[in-house]
From Swiss-Prot:
Species the sequence originates in: Herminiimonas arsenicoxydans
Record's keyword terms, sorted: Cell inner membrane, Cell membrane, Chaperone, Membrane, Protein transport, Transmembrane, Transmembrane helix, Transport
Matches recorded under Gene3D superfamilies: 2.70.98.90
Family: Belongs to the OXA1/ALB3/YidC family. Type 1 subfamily.
Protein name listed in UniProt: Membrane protein insertase YidC
Entry membrane topology: Multi-pass membrane protein
InterPro entries: Membr_insert_YidC (IPR019998), Membr_insert_YidC_N (IPR028053), YidC/ALB3/OXA1/COX18 (IPR001708), YidC/Oxa/ALB_C (IPR028055), YidC_ALB_C (IPR047196), YidC_periplasmic_sf (IPR038221)
Gene giving rise to this polypeptide: yidC
Record HAMAP family: YidC_type1
Membrane spanning residue stretches: 7-24, 219-239, 299-319, 340-360, 366-386, 436-456, 485-505, 526-546
GO CC aspect terms: plasma membrane
Location relative to the cell: Cell inner membrane
Length: 569
C-alpha cells in the first residue's frame, strides 16, 4: 500500500510536471524534456517594417493550392510611393486604424481590455511598430486589379459611433478600369466588422477576379496575457468543415512544411494569441483556397482566395465578408462562425473543460465575482465526488489504524519480501481494507484539476478579474511582492503558502509510511508543490486551496466521527 501511495504521488507530480512542460511549449518557451527550435525568431527591422509588408506579393490562386510556405508571384513589387492617411474609426469597443494605402487594417485597439498590470494601456492587436507586424489585408488577384498595395480614396463620412448604432468607412480604388470598393461597417457592441467588397468592371471586356483575405504577422509572440502568460502562443489557424480546426506554427511555415486544408466550401482563417483572436470569415458555401506563406524574414501570412466569378463589362460583383478581432469570449465566438469557438484552446481534456466552464458561467451569473465563483464551483465538484471520496477516506483511515501492525510485519519479515507481502495481504483481508482505496479521490481529481487549469488558462473572462486582495485571477498571487533574480521571475503570495499548509495537514491526516525515506518524501511534497504553485494562476491555486480545506474537513470528520476517533493512532 505504501509503495502504491508513493507511486500515486509520483504520478501526480509527473502530471503537474508534464502540465508545466506543456504550458512552456504552448507559450513558446523551451521544453524541459525536448530540444526544439523556437518559432520566435529575432525580429529583423527591414522585414517587419513598412517596406516588407507593403511590397509583399499578393497571393495567386494558381500557386497557393500547390505550395504552402513559399513566396508566390503576384502584382509587381516596387509600387510608387504615395502619401497615405490612416483613418481612425472609434466605436464603444475598439479604435481601429485603416490605411488608405491598400485599405489595410493597420491598428486595432480594444477599449475594454487593458494590459495586465497597467490599466492605462489598452490591448493592441493589429499594429506595426518596428518590433511587431500585425496587419489585415484584402484585395483582388487575377489581373492588374486593386490590391493591398494600391492607393484608395476615402468617401467622407462620420468616423466615430457617437449615438448611432453603426458607422461606415468606404474606400475606393480603380486600376485599369476595374474599381474595388471596400465598405467597412462597424456596429455598437460588436467586435465583428462587416467588410463588403464590390468589384465594378468599367472596361469593355469581361473579367474574372478573385478576392483574397490575408492576415500578416511576424514570427514573435505578442503580449495580451498576464505576467504569468507573458509570451502566450501566437500562430495561424485554418478551419474547414472537412478538416476542422488546424493550428499552423510559424516554424512549419518557415520550413515550408505547413500542413493544413488547401481547399473548401466553407471555413475561415485566423491568427490566434492568448486570450484574443483575429479572423477573416468569408461567406459560407463559397469555394475557396487556403494558403500560408513566408513573406520576408520573420514575416508570415495566412489567407484565403475566393473566386468572384465572371464580371461582365459595366457589371458589379459583390462579396460580403466578416472580420473579427477581439477577445476569446465564448458567447461572442459562437456567434461568429461554425467552429470558431475552437480558437479557445482547452487542451486534450476539452470534453471535461467545456462543462466546467459552462458551470462556472452559470455560477458567475448569480454571484458576479470570479473568485467566489471558483470557490462555489469547488464546493459543487466536491459534493459531486463526495460518495467516492468518502469511501477512499474511510479506506485511508482504516489504513492508519493498522499502520502499527504493518510496521510490525515489515520488521518481522525484513529481508524476506515474499513472506512480507503475503503477511500484508493477509492483514488487508482480515481488516477488510482495500490497499488502493485511498488513491481514488486523487485519481478522480487529476483530470478535473488539469481541465480547470486549461479553463483558467484560456478564459479571457477571468483575465483581470479581482477577488479580495487579488487583482488578476489569471495571474500568480503577488500579495507579498514580485522579484527578479537575473532572468528568473518569482512572485510570492499567500495562496501558495496556504496551499503548502493545507497539504502538510493532509499529510499528517494520512497514514504515515513505515519506510523512513517514504515518510520524508511525503513531508517534502507540500514544500515542492508550494514552490510550483507560486507560478500558477491565482484562480487555480484558489481552487486547490479550497479543495484541500474541504478534503481536510471531510477526512477529519471520517477519522473522528465515523471511526469513533480510533484513527488517531
Amino acid at each position: 500500500m505504501d509503495i502504491k501511495r508513493t507511486v500515486l504521488w509520483v504520478i501526480f507530480s509527473f502530471s503537474l510536471l508534464m502540465l508545466w512542460d506543456n504550458y512552456n511549449r504552448y507559450t513558446g518557451k523551451p521544453s524541459i524534456f525536448f530540444d526544439s527550435t523556437t518559432t520566435q525568431q529575432a525580429a529583423a527591422p527591414a522585414a517587419t517594417g513598412n517596406n516588407a509588408a507593403k511590397t509583399a506579393d499578393a497571393p495567386t490562386a494558381a500557386t497557393t493550392a500547390a505550395t504552402s510556405g513559399a513566396n508566390t508571384p503576384g502584382v509587381p513589387d516596387g509600387a510608387a510611393a504615395v502619401k497615405s492617411e490612416v483613418i481612425t474609426i472609434t466605436t464603444d469597443l475598439m479604435k481601429i486604424g485603416i490605411d488608405t494605402a491598400g485599405g489595410e487594417v493597420r491598428h486595432l485597439e480594444l477599449l475594454k481590455h487593458h494590459e495586465s498590470g497597467d490599466e492605462s494601456k489598452n490591448v493592441v492587436l493589429f499594429d506595426e511598430n518596428g518590433q511587431h507586424t500585425y496587419l489585415g489585408q484584402t484585395g483582388l488577384i487575377g489581373g492588374a486589379y486593386p490590391n493591398h498595395k494600391s492607393m484608395f480614396a476615402a468617401v467622407p463620412g462620420p468616423r466615430t459611433l457617437d449615438s448611432a448604432n453603426q458607422v461606415q468607412l468606404v474606400l475606393q480604388s480603380e486600376q485599369q478600369g476595374v474599381k474595388l470598393i471596400k465598405t467597412f461597417t462597424f456596429k455598437r457592441g460588436e467586435y465583428k466588422v462587416d467588410i463588403k467588397h464590390d468589384v465594378v468592371n468599367n472596361t469593355s471586356t469581361a473579367i474574372t477576379p478573385s478576392l483574397y483575405l490575408q492576415l500578416v504577422h511576424d514570427g514573435s509572440a505578442l503580449g495580451g496575457g498576464s505576467m504569468f502568460m507573458a509570451s502566450a502562443f501566437t500562430g495561424p489557424a485554418i478551419y474547414t468543415e472537412a478538416d476542422k480546426f488546424q493550428k499552423v506554427t510559424f516554424e512549419s511555415i518557415e520550413k515550408g512544411k505547413a500542413e493544413h486544408a488547401m481547399k473548401g466550401e466553407s471555413g475561415w482563417i485566423a491568427l490566434v494569441q492568448h486570450y484574443f483572436v483575429s479572423a477573416f470569415v468569408p461567406p459560407a458555401n463559397t469555394p475557396r483556397e487556403y494558403f500560408t506563406k513566408k513573406l520576408a524574414t520573420n514575416l508570415y501570412a495566412v489567407g484565403t482566395i475566393l473566386p468572384m466569378g465572371t464580371v461582365a463589362p459595366g457589371a458589379t460583383a459583390s462579396m460580403d465578408t466578416t472580420m473579427y478581432s477581439g477577445p476569446q469570449e465564448s458567447k461572442r465566438l459562437e456567434a461568429v462562425a461554425p467552429g470558431f469557438e475552437l480558437v479557445k484552446d482547452y487542451g486534450w481534456l476539452t470534453i471535461i473543460a467545456k462543462p466546467i466552464f459552462w458551470l462556472m458561467m452559470q455560477i458567475h451569473q448569480i454571484l458576479g465575482n470570479w473568485g467566489w465563483t471558483i470557490i462555489v464551483l469547488t464546493i459543487v465538484i466536491k459534493l459531486a465526488f463526495f460518495p467516492l471520496s468518502a469511501a477512499g477516506y474511510r479506506s485511508m483511515a482504516k489504513m492508519k489504524l493498522v499502520t502499527p501492525k504493518m510496521t510490525d510485519i515489515r520488521t518481522r519479515y525484513k529481508g524476506e519480501p515474499q513472506k512480507m507481502n503475503a503477511a500484508m495481504m493477509e492483514l488487508y483481508k482480515k481488516e477488510k481494507i482495500n490497499p488502493i482505496g485511498g488513491c481514488f479521490p486523487m485519481l478522480v481529481q487529476i483530470p478535473v484539476f488539469i481541465s480547470l487549469y486549461w479553463v483558467l488558462l484560456a478564459s479571457v473572462e477571468i483575465r483581470n478579474a479581482s477577488w479580495l486582495w487579488i487583482h488578476d485571477l489569471a495571474a500568480p498571487d503577488i500579495l507579498f511582492g514580485s522579484y527578479h533574480i537575473g532572468t528568473f521571475h518569482l512572485t510570492i503570495g499567500i495562496l501558495p503558502i496556504l496551499m503548502a499548509i493545507s497539504m502538510f495537514i493532509q499529510t499528517k491526516l494520512n497514514p504515515t509510511p513505515p519506510d523512513p525515506i517514504q515518510a520524508k518524501v511525503m513531508m517534502f511534497m507540500p514544500i515542492a508543490f508550494s514552490v510550483m504553485f507560486f507560478f500558477f494562476p491565482a484562480g487555480l491555486v484558489l481552487y486547490w486551496v479550497v479543495n484541500n480545506i474541504l478534503s481536510i474537513a471531510q477526512q477529519w470528520f471520517i477519522n473522528e466521527k465515523l471511526l469513533g476517533g480510533k484513527a488517531k493512532a
